Amino acid sequence: SQMRGRPNTRTVLTFVGKGDEKPLVVPFVREIIKVRSGKSNLVEPGFGYVRVVQFQEATAASLAEHLTQLYAKGPLTGLVLDLRNDPGGLLHGSVGVSAAFLPADTLVVSTDGRTPDAKRKYMATPDDYLRGTRTDFLKDLPAGVKNVPMVVLVNGGSASASEIVAGALQDHKRAKVLGTQTFGKGSVQTILPLTNKIGRASCRERV
């Protein structure tokens, strides 16, 4: 519990080892933990590799940056999207990643749930993948991104949002999916803002 708190506030951790006469007191400043949601590189000239580790708030925007950086080194003739051991995450992140490679207004995923709001279709359109900003980070992607031959890598650790991306790209014949059977989670998370700025709630939906 000592680890939790507002960013830039101070606290201490106290460690007591077996046989130690005095405890070890370590002061530290709390900070926001930033997890990299992806990485990329050129496997060889003309062939790009993008790994998505987890689907977070800014995953699709991060993907756009990686793709732009890859195309800055020259046109691609092939692209590998690695979703192995990606446990998934936020629904709009998977819609955004899918939208980077699919034609506009293409169906990405349908969700179902106990309430009418949970029953809906998500398309490859900014209204369905933008959250908290109206800046469309996919608008200026290199033209070749929509047509470059693709392979998506998956395994038993690929779940939730990563399964949505792999399934959407495969169903629309946009990419070949290679690897082993995925986890089969069948649910995703969405973030709902609460009133009076008291926080946010995480909600699960079945896909």
Q: What is the predicted function of each stretch?
A:
Residues 1-195, 206:
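Cleft-lining beta-strand/loop regions that shape enzyme active-site pockets
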